[in-house]
């Protein structure tokens, strides 16, 4: 799986605590190998017609992404689930 990132994602990643950044790396590698691996707890977000998904970094942090075909995805947002599930981000 090829992964692209947005400027927003990159900026948010840099603001994360180092411990969360360190947890994100192996989860991203797992996503590259198998985006539907059970430990990622992937879920499609609402509204479902936006085709936006999330997976867990840990209990509190998520990566929001969109598939761009069979072997490509773009990471849109990363952060605490209370912050990134604010649907204003998707408008």
Residue ranges with predicted function:
Residues 61-62, 66-91:
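Enriched for short, Lys/Arg-rich terminal
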Residues 3, 22, 36-39, 78:
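Non-catalytic, surface-exposed connector residues within folded enzymatic/regulatory domains
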Residues 27-30, 81:
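Conserved short hydrophobic interaction patches
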Residues 1-27:
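Arg/Lys-rich, positively charged N-terminal/basic patches that mediate binding to nucleic acids
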Residues 30-55:
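A short, surface-exposed loop/turn module that caps and links secondary-structure elements
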């Amino acid at each position: 799986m090829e992964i692209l990132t947005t400027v927003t994602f990159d900026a948010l990643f840099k603001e994360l605590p180092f411990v969360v950044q360190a947890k994100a790396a192996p989860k991203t590698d797992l996503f590259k190998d198998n985006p539907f691996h059970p430990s990622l707890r992937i879920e499609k977000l609402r509204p479902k017609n936006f085709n936006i998904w999330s997976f867990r970094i840990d209990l509190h942090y998520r990566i929001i992404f969109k598939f761009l075909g069979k072997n490509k995805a773009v990471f849109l947002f990363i952060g605490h689930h209370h912050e990134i599930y604010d649907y204003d981000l998707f408008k």
